[in-house]
UniProtKB/Swiss-Prot annotation:
Its main location: cytoplasm. CDD domains: AAK_NAGK-C. Pathway: Amino-acid biosynthesis; L-arginine biosynthesis; N(2)-acetyl-L-ornithine from L-glutamate: step 2/4. The lineage of its organism: Bacteria, Pseudomonadati, Pseudomonadota, Betaproteobacteria, Burkholderiales. This is Acetylglutamate kinase. Gene3D superfamilies: Acetylglutamate kinase-like. GO terms for biological process: arginine biosynthetic process via ornithine; L-arginine biosynthetic process.
Amino acid sequence: MAPPVPAPSSDLPNIAPRDKAEILAQALPYIRKFHGKTLVIKYGGNAMTDPALQQDFAEDIVLLKLVGMNPVVVHGGGPQIDEALSRLGKKGTFIQGMRVTDEETMEVVEWVLGGEVQQDIVGLINAVGGKAVGLTGRDGGMIRARKLKMVDKDDPSIEHDVGQVGEITAIDPAVVKALQDDQFIPVVSPIGFGEHNESYNINADMVASKLATVLQAEKLMLLTNTPGVLDKAGKLLTNLSAREIDELFADGTISGGMLPKIAGALDAAKSGVNAVHIIDGRVPHAMLLEILSDQAYGTMIRSH
């Protein structure tokens, strides 16, 4: 196994040329291993709002494409939606990690995610030499959905109405594959459509997980604002099985926005995605180090 690649820091420009060459050489086995493979990355959290991390992310995505991998980006945008709602005098409400989405909120979600946020990401990637194309689940009939029936996690007899929040019924990845074949980088907004052409706000982690499954991705990486999954004492859990995850659900260790993230990650692992990682998006280049070295950042989810 190759020695770990040093974590990037502000001292990187001062590394001797020979050491820089060694770092690049250590990445070669991983470049060979993942050449031609699809990697689905859920982009969210601080990595989307910190300018330096935004730049790092865009450069990392372009590098992965240039060395022969096929990155697919699925993005969130919770803080941006909250800001837009605040300007309209509305406050976001969440139930079990899902945003309650009435008709007005759905309109905001569509123009924030499918417009402002998506175009910012596409622009960043293209500015550093990539060829990114923005999509929503409507494009190419990619993401079909229906209204999510949310049962209370403590009392199954209670069902919560979360408005136009959707659950995925089918994903047609044809448009994503066509873009990949032409060397584009797909950037997907988590908006689906129903049988009557109604729009649905879908959790971005769930979209990333389902898309990774249908694309038979080699890796699914979910960027977060935490080091990974933490136990009740705040200690990082670096490796979790399905059984351990069930226990963490039951005792309340996993809650809030982490609920759909872990559920989606586990579903992808059970459905054949080779490696599923929850990664600290606040660490510069953590995604790149996870792929191109034996450094471990965050939590790995296993189906067994």
